Amino acid sequence: MSPAGVPDALPFTLVQRRGAMLVTHRSFRFRCVCGQMHTGSPNYGFTAPDAFVGQPPQVKAAAAYSRDFCAYVDTQGQRFYFARALLRVPIQLSDDPFMWGLWVQLGLEDYRQYLDAYERSDADFCLTAWIRNNLPVYPPTDGMPVQLVPQAGRQLATVRIPRNDHRLALDFNEGIAPARAARIAATFCLAGVKGPAPAEGTPIPL
């Protein structure tokens, strides 16, 4: 354990044989402040867009809401469209990323295009979207413009963040230091973010 309760991020290389090939995987591993050793990608996500969580009961009741999609009309008659997506933040010196399951907002035409791509296996394009969750360990991320990349086979779309000076954009484009990734994961562990999903809109393990 490092001084002052800071979790240790440890190198861990796994070599596997696949046929005639030896494949090396640099796994992320750290000893948490809880005393346990964790290996692999930290995974956390949100059950709903923050904007949807704050809507009154009648709006939620009339919404089209599922595990991966959300569309609703607010009390002013405005329509909103969202999709759940996966943000992979690289961890330096590791092949395991820090993964966030978050919600992005789309315009109507892009939402329709994404729904169509979700059912196909040949999607190869990007859509303009906006993150609609605040990641708790970063400066505000709600409203951050991103690119949404549909994936084949009804898989979650992935998120790309253009280069800018926001801490999340820097982490996405340059990678996050292993020790910092361990500290972030430890904050969720200490907060008891594990097991059954808590209330909608709060981080949960994917």
Located regions from the model:
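Basic, glycine-/proline-tolerant helical and adjacent loop/strand elements
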Residues: 11-92, 96
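Arginine residue identity/basic-tract feature
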Residues: 17-18, 26-31, 67, 79, ...
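Charged, low-complexity interaction segments
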Residues: 63-152
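C-terminal, charged low-complexity interaction regions
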Residues: 117-206
